[in-house]
């Protein structure tokens, strides 16, 4: 086991604070509408340029092990806030640094760190309650666009495109972000349910211009096994042929004789049919087939529930207004399922989302909800260079998370104003002793830090602005983008309540742990002896001449 270096008391804390300051100083230059960029070196390819706090934080590794521990703890604040709220990482870092710096003064003065932490925790609980009271619901498209713009560092185009996307696919819809091909941002909306499986044979194509197979008012056969024997399929095919409507077959696979017969029938014009593989794998495939059945008002023909392909009837088939099948995707538009059944299925999947343990499962379940409930919107990010594309894409993703958070818990006045207005709740807060009261004072001072940093980055005098904002009431604040004072909500400077709350909670949690630290242990770097010359066989023991 390697030898360890141990530091106690002030020498440990001073090292930790130094690490906190290095990381926070690098991150906080990005805060606010006039925040600056940070350039990150890459071992290959062009450097990355970012204004995203968590991206900067993740890059920082310090040589000094004790300083690095402090930096890593603040990094945890940024990444945790990013995970929960999707934005507010810089605000969280600034708050953590402020609480640590203020708190260390009291610790150095000999106060009990545990009571200070209890005071900080009480203050934060009180502030979080007040932020929830201040929050207003974020319902209109205009408010969603404003939240998106602020989060994307005052880029109104990004805010508007996100608001449009949410309007088209609903608040629950899936919105994905991809690299675009042009210089401008574009929005593509896929209506209906789309899944990533295409036609099994190009002979099914009936629209040569678009290279798709389009079926109007088709029946939809859902089968959970492979279809290779045409005899099993014949009864259904005959019933569909009599009805004169096209047929979409979704099965685990359609192969051999069955596929060949379907292709021949299509080419001869006897029956308009398209076969595709079922989406997903294993249990997820079964679930997705059931989703399609609910959406189209059909049943999954599965042997485990006593249904067989040869006995399938038209009543068991799903229906839709239109189906488009491309090489890689199938889209079912306007399924014939009943609204109440679809809503019940959505509710069922939402319960699974609450119980899901992994992010991957949660994401896949949310996609299924969106496909049933609304649709899927794709924002294609446009930029002139790859470096700009990466930076812009990260901002769009941040803005998307922020707007979702705003819809969830409402909005508060932005620019650090919400925290200053919530401080009124701390003035009459009851504490058990003077040291806990000092903990409350630490938070009172720290919640000014985000506004101070925004003003500093804008090139103005922080103390003057903070005093003027404190003199005002309600939503009165300072708009750093225009240099004006006024009603923050009217000026469109909004923050999601969830982002402000998460930033404060995570900052206080980690900063409280740092204040109560009295010992730090790190591995000592090993001094490796210089390697001797290798044994030069046959030269009579001249090996270790070094």
Swiss-Prot record:
Coiled-coil intervals: none
Protein name per its UniProtKB record: Chaperonin GroEL 2
Keywords: ATP-binding, Chaperone, Cytoplasm, Isomerase, Nucleotide-binding
CC per GO annotation: cytoplasm
Record: residues binding ATP: 30-33, 51, 87-91, 415, 479-481, 495
Record-level GO BP terms: protein refolding
Reactions performed catalytically: ATP + H2O + a folded polypeptide = ADP + phosphate + an unfolded polypeptide
Membership in a protein family: Belongs to the chaperonin (HSP60) family.
Subunit structure comment from the entry: Forms a cylinder of 14 subunits composed of two heptameric rings stacked back-to-back. Interacts with the co-chaperonin GroES.
EC number: 5.6.1.7
Gene3D superfamilies per record: GroEL (3.50.7.10), GroEL-like equatorial domain (1.10.560.10), TCP-1-like chaperonin intermediate domain (3.30.260.10)
Keyword Chaperone listed: yes
InterPro entries: Chaperonin_Cpn60_CS (IPR018370), Cpn60/GroEL (IPR001844), Cpn60/GroEL/TCP-1 (IPR002423), GroEL-like_apical_dom_sf (IPR027409), GROEL-like_equatorial_sf (IPR027413), TCP-1-like_intermed_sf (IPR027410)
Role summary: Together with its co-chaperonin GroES, plays an essential role in assisting protein folding. The GroEL-GroES system forms a nano-cage that allows encapsulation of the non-native substrate proteins and provides a physical environment optimized to promote and accelerate protein folding.
Classification of source organism: Bacteria, Pseudomonadati, Pseudomonadota, Betaproteobacteria, Neisseriales
UniProt keyword Protease present: no
């Amino acid at each position: 086991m390697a030898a360890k270096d141990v530091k106690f008391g002030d020498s440990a804390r001073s090292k930790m604070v130094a690490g906190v300051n290095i990381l926070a100083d690098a991150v906080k230059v990005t805060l606010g509408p006039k925040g600056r960029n940070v350039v990150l070196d890459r071992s290959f390819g062009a450097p990355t340029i970012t204004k995203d706090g968590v991206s900067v934080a993740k890059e920082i590794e310090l040589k000094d092990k004790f300083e690095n521990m402090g930096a890593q703890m603040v990094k945890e604040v940024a990444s945790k806030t990013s995970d929960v709220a999707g934005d507010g990482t810089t605000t969280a870092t600034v708050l953590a640094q402020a609480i640590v710096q203020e708190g260390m003064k009291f610790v150095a003065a000999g106060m009990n760190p545990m009571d200070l932490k209890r005071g900080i925790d009480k203050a934060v609980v009180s502030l979080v309650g007040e932020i929830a009271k201040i929050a207003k619901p974020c319902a209109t498209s205009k408010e969603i666009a404003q939240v998106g713009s602020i989060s994307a560092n005052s880029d109104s185009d990004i805010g508007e495109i996100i608001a449009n996307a949410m309007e088209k696919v609903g608040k629950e819809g899936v919105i994905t972000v991809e690299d675009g091909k042009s210089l401008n941002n574009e929005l593509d909306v896929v209506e209906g349910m789309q899944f990533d499986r295409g036609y099994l044979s190009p002979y099914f194509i009936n629209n040569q211009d678009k290279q798709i197979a389009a079926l109007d008012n088709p029946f939809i056969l859902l089968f959970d096994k492979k279809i290779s024997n045409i005899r099993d399929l014949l009864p259904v095919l005959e019933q569909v042929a009599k009805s004169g409507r096209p047929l979409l077959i979704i099965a685990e696979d359609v192969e051999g004789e069955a596929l060949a017969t379907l292709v021949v029938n299509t080419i001869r014009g006897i029956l308009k049919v398209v076969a595709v593989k079922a989406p997903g794998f294993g249990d997820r495939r079964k679930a997705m087939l059931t989703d399609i059945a609910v959406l189209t008002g059909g049943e999954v023909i599965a042997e485990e529930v006593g249904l067989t392909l040869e006995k399938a009837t038209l009543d068991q088939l799903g229906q839709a207004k239109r189906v488009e099948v491309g090489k890689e995707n199938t889209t079912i538009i306007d399924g014939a399922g009943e609204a109440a059944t679809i809503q019940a299925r959505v509710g069922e999947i939402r319960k699974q989302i609450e119980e899901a343990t992994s992010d991957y499962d949660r994401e896949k379940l949310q996609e299924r909800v969106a496909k049933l409930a609304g649709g899927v919107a794709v924002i294609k990010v446009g930029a002139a260079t790859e470096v700009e594309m990466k930076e812009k894409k990260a901002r769009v993703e941040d803005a998307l998370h922020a707007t979702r958070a705003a819809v969830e818990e409402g909005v508060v006045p932005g620019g650090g104003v919400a925290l200053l207005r919530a401080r009124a709740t701390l003035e009459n807060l009851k504490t058990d002793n003077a040291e806990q009261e000092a903990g409350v004072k630490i938070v009172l001072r720290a919640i000014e830090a985000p506004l101070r940093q925004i003003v500093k980055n804008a090139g103005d005098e922080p103390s003057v602005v903070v005093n003027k904002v404190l003199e005002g009431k309600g939503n009165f604040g300072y708009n750093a983008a225009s240099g004006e004072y006024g009603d923050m909500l009217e000026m469109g400077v909004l923050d999601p309540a969830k982002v402000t709350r998460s930033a404060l909670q995570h900052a206080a949690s980690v900063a409280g742990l740092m204040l109560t630290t009295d010992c730090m242990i790190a591995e000592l770097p090993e001094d490796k002896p210089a390697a001797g010359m290798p044994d030069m066989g046959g030269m009579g023991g001249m090996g270790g001449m070094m």
